[in-house]
């Protein structure tokens, strides 16, 4: 993510300030803001009232949400505008009416303010202290809003979103493979505790929506992003340390190359004995190769092919990084609790989204797609167990793998892929061939679980072939390889 500052004035400088009587800004703000804020010009829709400052703020916020989010220019503009509105409200108030005047700022104001502050942390990831201050300030803002609007669903979702993002940017980012639970607790980095707390906040938003029968918030990709962020976090945990290990391997390879170069530079001329030995070895090797040539050519070719296949398999199967039990992420990685939480609440999200008559078709497809993919992923283990026990001679006589018999593995895998197909079909986009191919690939996976040349298998293959042919024609041959593999 971009770290360069394209904001107003000088580089963003985190500065946490204590709010007193709703009048003092708590947000870390860029310096030189007053003179440069006016330089930010955003074209707002004609429907936005030029005299409605909150409407203008919402327009500015929407501009950022709809952008590539690769610059903090608009974010700084939003924060400065929020600061100004807050100061202006307090300045125009007096005496006991102060709280009433401050309350005129709607819940949306606190949401926008908090999100802008948390998003700004993305542009300062090289300074963990600044990241911490941005998240602290954003949480203070959303909590201020919740004090005034405790039943506002958007604010509760906003808090959950900030907490999840904070876990990744502020806490997980500081962990190493050698990090320990004890060290994490000292630094107030109880990742599991913070994740549990964030998920409880999300659940409270769900509960409020159900109690009030207000499901409008679920029609926003902003809040769907929360579940995606949870999924991404779990993916980070599953693959934690891989990048660190790859970097170490690259460094070792570079060091070896340097050592070889140094050795070559330091090496002197060969002695007569060295030369004689080398010539004798070369002659013997040539004689052996001449005698064996032809008689072993086919055998060698087969061995080479087998070695190449094994190398390809090794490349495809990345070795899993094992975390020690003392690692802060170990307890999250080794339980299925959070994957199940994601699945359950994604299903709830889809159910709530369907309550709306004007639910976003794009969002419906995306949620269905993610659910379909999650069921396919879950089906990988039982599918592999079935294939291994059924067709791999090396496992002949073995009745169970991963706690599953051949029949159980087949049944479980079939059920999961059938479920996946249900969601993938609901995610189909008539204008997007890739969504068709997702369905075809799931059909092929399901077909492979039936008896060879059975009626069920042949029907699934035929259906998949039709879909792949259609997708291939629509994309000028993009899926020809997939089609050839099926027909071959």
Curated annotation (Swiss-Prot):
Pfam families: Nro1. The keyword Cytoplasm does not apply. The gene is ETT1. PANTHER family: ENHANCER OF TRANSLATION TERMINATION 1. It comes from the Eukaryota. One of its GO terms (cellular component) is nucleus. This is Enhancer of translation termination 1. Belongs to the ETT1 family. Required for correct translation termination and probably involved in regulation of hypoxic gene expression. Residues 26-38 have a biased composition (Polar residues). Keywords: Nucleus, Transcription, Transcription regulation, Translation regulation. Residues 1-38, 242-272, 287-328 are annotated as: Disordered. Residues 244-260, 298-323 have a biased composition (Acidic residues). It is found in: Nucleus. Residues 287-296 have a biased composition (Basic and acidic residues). GO terms for biological process: positive regulation of SREBP signaling pathway; regulation of translation. Its main location: nucleus. The keyword Transcription regulation applies. The lineage of its organism: Eukaryota, Fungi, Dikarya, Ascomycota, Saccharomycotina.
